[in-house]
Amino acid sequence: MELLNEIKFFNRTNKIPSQCLKEAFLNTMLFEETLSENDEPVNSPERVDVLNHINNDDYVRNNYTSFANELMHSRYSSFLTHYAVDEMEKLNIQTFQVPGYEIGFGLKKLPEGIDIVGVHNNTNIKGVGEALIDSAIRLGGTHLDHFDGFLSDFYSKKGFEEYERWKWNDEYAPKGWNYDKYGRPDVILRRLKSFKP
């Protein structure tokens, strides 16, 4: 029965459970860091520059080699789903990178909708996560996944509704998962309320 559920999930989302866990972890870690603006001066020149790029949807697009390198060099690299350059091309993943900064995300076509994937911020610039998600939505993102916790309210306020929830399964835990620090949170799959399949 478990295998049947995994096959059904894969057919519906084009993801395997371990990939979903990795993406959920990264989304959670990104926002744990980027939503906190207390560490970075609100008007630092770098933050203002990054937000100007993001708010104007000004990105380097589809530079797959650079995008793959940024994911590989992320401090959360071991928790990320790494896409090879040829895989990104084959899946037609659209990548968006802030010029001059290792910040970006990808959009991946699903059978129904577009998944926000590979969200990363390899800089020390904080407080840009909300603008990054707003931009991903403007550019067509309709779905995402994350671990249950503080992001649940954030994504609800952004217009994402839960459509599926997985109980934690140790079998799919990312390598090196710190149970003492992160526990065993549910994985929540969300889509925009305005999304119509």
Q: Which residue stretches match the model-derived regions?
A:
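Short, intrinsically disordered N-terminal pre-domain segments
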Residues: 1-12
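Non-catalytic substrate-recognition and accessory regions of acyl/acetyltransferase enzymes
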Residues: 14-124, 135-143, 152-158, 165-197
